[in-house]
């Protein structure tokens, strides 16, 4: 296998799935003997990329305004200096800057994009389809790309996201963690734990989750909403808490806020939910929960549907059908009820498939 020079472009390197994936992929490239160059405005993962042997070049390609396009000149300099084989764009603003940089290059690298979402502004997003090849993270995203941008099947490869079994596995939480958890959340002890891991947002299904708990209304169960609320969402969070109070559910639902021990929370959860009312492009929390040994449930659409169809069909429920969600929850939550199949969505598969795609595209270009 020939050695590659790969450039990845994204706005910043702070906390997020795309950012962490870029960092992990950079590390994997270096481990396999390739050269990895990441271009962004920097952030928390910047030093980790460098420590793992990658190169990070800081450019202000993160701001969504026309002046950012002036950074195309800087990208041209980088490409002429490093002569990459592959440029991989992971976000729209950097992709536009790259688009104008490529216009100034005589010898162009292979250009790949990953659609990490179902973008809501097609005119702004079309640059992600103006590439040699596109990666879709699910069939749902592939269909969106085909229908919105008229990209041919042969120019799209589905490479699902994956999780790292070192982080998400079935090793039981240690006693120290459990003691600290039950000290902080004594209301969860000896309960059937139902968990919704999500940031607080109107489309993420927290309302539906509260409705589910109201319908079950049994203190043998305790519900956790695990995730942050941004300042913009504080009013919505207050509305949710008022709804809980009005329904008399205060003792049955806990908002934990942002946590860095989500893998252990999955492990103590009897069921983990994805109830997003818009189709998820993939459904990362669903595979993380399955990998951690939890049962999972979700609405029958988007990337969540694709994962559950493969690994746990019993967890699928028709969109917004709270009665069915309750009925299936009561069945699945029983201790002896079957758990999902082994998780097949692994980060190692994502890495191997992406590198193989690069090699295939380079071979086809000769």
Tell where the protein language model's regions lie, with residue ranges.
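Active-site donor-binding acidic/aromatic loop of nucleotide-activated sugar
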Residues: 232-237, 250-259, 265, 316
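A conserved, positively charged/aromatic
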Residues: 103-139
